[in-house]
Amino acid sequence: MSLPMSPVSPINTTTSTSTTTTPLSPPSSIENSSHPLSTSISNNSITSDSSLDSNTSTSSTTTTNYGTKTPSGNARIFNCTLCQRAFTREEHLTRHTLSTHNKLKPFTCGICSRPFSRRDLLLRHAKNLHQGSEVAVSRIRKSYKHCNKDNDSKSGSDSNTNKTNKNGKKQEQEDDEEEGSRSDSSSGADDEDSNTSSGGSNYHAIGSGNKRFVNNSPQLKKILTNGSVPSTTTTSTTTVPTSTNNDTASITNSSTSHIHQRSLNVEDYDTPEKKRLKMSVNMLVS
């Protein structure tokens, strides 16, 4: 016995495809909530940046205004008219105006020729990139000091040499004068000895300072040999070079000796003491 077969109804494909192909749309609440989040984040970032800028500007203006003090206690007296910044020293203000407002860069690196507005920036550049090379930084002031020191040392050495030369010349002059006085004294002693040995009165001395000059005139010798001494006047002029500051001056000494006419006696010249007395008298008279 067979069971009755019911007819199979065909499957509606259109409905299934339609259900599967329809996209799922997100709820309207989610769409509406996504936009305010992004806008709020961007607004927060903008406000934070603006607040930071305002804080830094206010802090810089408050810390560098006219009349404020540094941490060390120095007052900022010099005020910039362009940006209202104040400085403790005038050179700091001029450096600020030249580098910041005038855009001047007078300091250049000696190796890479990069210009800088301040010397400390050039020093930092040379230290970081060129291992602190002296070629990168100009040393004009230091070399000028060294040149000044060298010139001072040269001038000092020259003055010392001049002083030593002057002292040496003075010592030489003194030595020459001492030698001259010694030679004069020795020659005077020799003349006295010769006169005492000869037994004549042909010795005529002229005193000029510390030196003595002997005048042995032939007329006196002739008169003494004849036996009578007439009254005569003899004048002798001698020039003595005296060195005073390397200048020579001729000194003329005139001496007159009056010899009275008397008979020549041998008894008057026996003792050397009488001769010395007569010599001293003649020197005093002259």
Curated annotation (Swiss-Prot):
Q: Name one GO biological process term.
A: single-species biofilm formation on inanimate substrate
Query: Which SUPFAM superfamilies does the protein's record reference?
Result: beta-beta-alpha zinc fingers (SSF57667)
| Task performed by this protein | Transcription factor required for yeast cell adherence to silicone substrate.
Residue ranges of the region described as Disordered: 1-71, 146-260
Q: Name one Pfam family in it.
A: zf-C2H2
Which GO terms of the molecular function aspect are on file? DNA-binding transcription factor activity, RNA polymerase II-specific; RNA polymerase II cis-regulatory region sequence-specific DNA binding; zinc ion binding
> Keywords for this entry?
Cell adhesion, Metal-binding, Nucleus, Repeat, Transcription, Transcription regulation, Zinc, Zinc-finger
What is the reported phenotype of gene knockout?
Answer: Decreases cell adherence to silicone substrate.
Q: Which GO terms describe its cellular component?
A: nucleus
Protein name from the UniProt record: Transcriptional regulator of yeast form adherence 4
